[in-house]
Amino acid sequence: MYNILVCDDDREIVDAIEIYLTQEGYHVLKAYDGMQAIQMLEREEIQLLIIDVMMPKLDGIRATLKIREKSSIPIIILSAKSEDVDKILGLNIGADDYVTEPFNPLELVARVKSQLRRYTKLGNLPADDGENVYQVGGLLVNDDLKEVSVEGEPVKLTPIEYNILLLLVKNPGKVFSIEQIYESIWNEEAIGADNTVAVHIRHIREKIEINPKEPRYLKVVWGIGYKIEKQ
C-alpha cells in the first residue's frame, strides 16, 4: 500500500482528498503546514506528497525546496492560483505536477496514479545485465539500475527528469517536439505544455551539463524541440 502525505492548512480539503485516495486503496497521512510535512517525511516512508502553496509557518514553496534537498519523491502542488507564472514557480522548485484549486478530485487521483507509476518504475532495481544502458559521450544512463552519471559522477534526477532524459538518450540525434515529450511522459494531451517541458529541460541541463547555457548533450532545435546530441 502506498503512503501519500497530504499537506494543506484547510482541514476540509485534506479530509476530502483523503476520502478519494482511500477509496483507491492508498494510505493517507495528513499535515497542516510545511513544518509538519517535513517532520512526517523524516519519520514515515512516504511515496508521494500533495502540498498546498499558501500555508502558515512554512508555505508549500519553501517546504518543497527543503524536501528536494533530501528526497526525490513525486510532489504535486495545490494552489488557488492559475497563472502560468505560479505553475512555473512550482515546477522550478522541484514539483513534478501542479493542480489548480478548485480541482476535480478524479483528476487529482488520476495525476497521483500517474506519478506513482513513474516513481515505482524508477524504483525498480532489476539485475544489471547491461542491456538497458545508454551512453552518449560522458553521459551514461543505466535504465536497469535507474542511475545517471556524467563523466563517472552520479547525477540525481527527479522521476520526471529521469524519464525525459531516458526518452531522449535512447534516441540520440532524434528531435522530439514539446508535444511529443509531454504526451510520452505525462500520458495526456499536450495543451499549454511549453512552459512545463521547458522548466524540466532546464533542470536536467543544470544537472548534466558543465555549462547549461552552452549544452554539450541536451540541445534545443529552435522552433521544433529538443534532442540529445550524438557524440
Stretches with model-predicted labels:
Residues 15-23:
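Charged docking surfaces used in two-component/phosphorelay signaling
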Residues 32-36, 59-62, 86:
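Acidic catalytic/metal-coordinating carboxylates
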Residues 44-51:
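Active-site beta3 strand of CheY-like receiver
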